[in-house]
């Protein structure tokens, strides 16, 4: 895991992935491409600030040496984007474009932060799940040496701009965890830090040639196991 690239590094999961990678002394370089500077800093960080997302594919291609692993936690909300059509351009189209650019550049592993709903029966009907499913299918079709799909349920984390109704949902999920045990909470949602760590842990396992499959999907139980139970600082 000599060199890594984090897309969506200013978001709730992407920023967690970035912080985790920057704290890892075994990683020589951590690149980011974003519209604004990430909050985390460190001697191994190489941040590219580019407001024009149509240039991100070219920026990715220009990173030398080519990152061994690319993480994408890239995404927005319908409210922030100004509607489903604009959200689709980021959550689906930009992710697809960057996955294609990563494959063309020779990236070995691609890690995508998806959603639990992308694997459900309604994934073809719910707009958000449909976006994520489309990206997953593209990544699978690109045939990376290693693809890792992370499917968290409710993301238990504070956001700069809260999703509509998210604070209430997060509060209710944590309350159920207090009342009925952490096991129930783990099924309903995962802490943002745990999700980020699970993504990094899975990539490390893959780099060691120990991934269970070439196209590895992490569901809620896998996220908790890799990001908390088996995690070692």
From Swiss-Prot:
Pfam families: Epimerase (PF01370). Residues 1-36 form a transit peptide. GO terms for cellular component: mitochondrial outer membrane. The keyword Mitochondrion applies. Its main location: mitochondrion. One of its GO terms (biological process) is import into nucleus. It is a peripheral membrane protein. It is found in: Mitochondrion outer membrane. Belongs to the FMP52 family. This is Protein FMP52, mitochondrial. Keywords: Membrane, Mitochondrion, Mitochondrion outer membrane, Transit peptide. Transmembrane segments: none annotated.
């Amino acid at each position: 895991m000599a060199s890594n690239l984090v897309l969506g590094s200013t978001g709730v999961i992407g920023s967690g992935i970035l912080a985790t990678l920057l704290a890892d002394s075994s990683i020589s370089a951590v690149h980011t491409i974003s519209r604004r500077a990430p909050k985390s800093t460190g001697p191994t960080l190489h941040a590219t600030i580019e407001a024009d997302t149509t240039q991100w594919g070219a920026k990715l291609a220009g990173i030398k040496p080519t990152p061994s692993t690319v993480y994408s936690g890239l995404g927005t909300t319908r409210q922030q984007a100004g509607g489903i059509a604009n959200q689709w351009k980021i959550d689906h189209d930009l992710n697809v474009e960057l996955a294609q650019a990563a494959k063309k550049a020779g990236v070995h592993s691609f890690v995508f932060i998806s959603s639990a709903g992308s694997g459900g029966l309604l994934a073809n009907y719910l707009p958000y799940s449909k976006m994520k499913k489309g990206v997953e299918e593209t990544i699978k079709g690109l045939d990376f040496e290693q693809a890792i799909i992370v499917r968290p349920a409710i993301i238990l984390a504070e956001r700069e701009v809260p999703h509509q109704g998210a604070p209430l949902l997060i509060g209710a999920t944590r309350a159920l965890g207090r009342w009925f045990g952490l096991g129930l909470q783990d099924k309903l949602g995962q802490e943002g830090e745990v999700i980020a760590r699970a993504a990094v842990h899975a990539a490390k396992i893959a780099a060691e040639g120990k991934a269970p499959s070439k196209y590895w999907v992490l569901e809620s139980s896998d996220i908790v196991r890799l990001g908390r139970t088996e995690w070692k600082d």
